[in-house]
Amino acid sequence: MFIKTNKGQVDQKWYMGLTYEDDNGNDTDYTIETDGNIAAVALEDGYGDEFGIIKGEEAYLNINTIIKNIDKRFYVDATNNLVMFTDATKTYKTKIGGKTINETENTDYVISFMDGKNCYVNVKFVKKYVDFDYKVVKAEGKSPARIVLKYTSGEKNQMTVKSNIEMRTKADYQNLIVTTLKKNTKVTVLEESGDWTKVGTDDGFMGYVPAKKLKDKETKKTDFKSDADTYTHVLMDKKISLGWNAITNLTANGNLETIIEHTKGLNVISPTWYSLSDNKGNLRSYASATYVEKAHSKGLKVWALVNDFGTQDKASKEYTKKVLTDTTKRENLVDNIMTNIKDYNLDGINIDFEFINKDIINSYLQFLRELSIECRKAGKVLSIDNYVPSSGSEYYDIAHQSLVADYIIIMSYDEHYAGSKEAGSVSSMTFTEKAVSDAIALTCDASRVINGMPFYTRAWITTPATDGKKGEGVYVEDATNGNYYLSSQAITMDKAKELYTNAKVKPTFDETTGQNFVSYEKGDSTVSIWLEDATSVKSRLDIMEKYKLAGVAYWRLGQETDSIWDTIYPYFK
């Protein structure tokens, strides 16, 4: 059978991501400001978004390529002219453009350099701390230089080319040729789909060949060494029952005995003592030695909370960015935290940073790595609060956090929140269970995941919209039932009971949320409350048992009914 084939050759620079489209729509080669040659970066399943640079015999990767593909523990601080790597016990600092590590260890190569705003790191420096393979292929003819990377452990299939055959850009004879593979060339199978197979060569070519042109499939196992077992964790020998204690001034510390008077089964308390006070890494503190002494006398561990939103304004966000992205300031923050741990005899620390965006996530993770080293040395617990796993919070990288932290706390509430366009539960059981299971999938260790649960709920007020009259809350358009205004108020368990008791209504069980629910009319409005009570709390504790979690955390102490501890206690006695 005659097969019409395309004999055209693809522009390999374009194919490997070494060109860009200029303002006139023309493909233009990337250029660099420094000396050296641009090289394509062949990842395990495609070409990297960032090119590499070859200087003489030395090969350099964009640090973003390293972080995204090889190891997230590399970090660049352009402000202080540093490239760093942090493991379980130490941070290795190098000056950009230098050859020395931690000012004591000399190398025979330049470790890193800047090209414009981009940082490039020598593959030898990366290889010093991380087990992976690389191969440097020099440019030849129309083929650009390539840095070929292998970094994932596991099994992959290899096959042999039966006879000379063109590798193509896509799975069809009409697509352009990448290169010609010679008979008996060994290739790694990247993707199998019908008549065509995507393959990669040891020298960094990737593309499609007819499946019938391959033979002798064999499985090759790669096992790169990992240092994950060097990350020891400070863990409690019992299920954790943690209560956050909102402290907004020094006087509030005096209420400790009142706030824990009716608790049963509580074994950790987390006072919200610390927040960033400036852009230098200093802390605003409401810490109290007397508070810690009393808590310890009651058998409670104290994990003081540090947040980055203490002033709840634009300044707080700026503090977070400026402190975390500057190594000098970030280290000052770590030092201040550890000083407070020592001075107040704290058992651990709870990090609750919520002003983290994608631009500073690498700096936040570096902060956690650096803090974890000091906590590990001191034998103090490091717990980190996180939003419920979702596409919007994915960049927080719970998987990497769990490597360095002792416990990951998932704040499984605010499913519906102030400003929501829909009334609903603060934390339905389906929402909670998904949050827990997703967190376990990311951490791979349920025994270090703590589920944060609400001790509060919301009273939702729905008011029909009338012409010319503006209501309170969010305006919601509803073509079926009529437009309305929706507002809500956070309320305690006792307040919720007071409201529905005064309205002379009784709760009914809502199968959808797994909670008791009340609804009643108040004037022109409808009030709806998904209750937090013994039913919902028990269900969440059952989820803790089902998934074998490390424990639970309650936001916040003082919002619960006294009797709720009778429900909690059996799980922790």
Question: What do these predicted ranges mean?
Answer:
Residues 221-331, 336:
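Glycan-recognition patch characteristic of GH18 chitinases/ENGases
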Residues 222-227, 311-312, 319, 457-540, ...:
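Glycan-binding loop/region signatures in secreted carbohydrate-active enzymes
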Residues 269, 351, 408, 451, ...:
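Conserved, mostly hydrophobic/aromatic
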Residues 279-286, 335, 358-496:
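Substrate-binding surface in catalytic domains of secreted glycosidases
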Residues 184, 196-201, 209:
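SH3/SH3-like beta-barrel fold
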Residues 248-264, 327-342, 390-398, 532-545:
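Short, acidic/polar
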Residues 1-193, 223-231, 235:
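Primary recognition of N-terminal secretory signal peptides and signal-anchoring hydrophobic helices
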Residues 536-573:
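Acidic/aromatic/glycine-rich contiguous surface patches that form carbohydrate-binding/processing clefts
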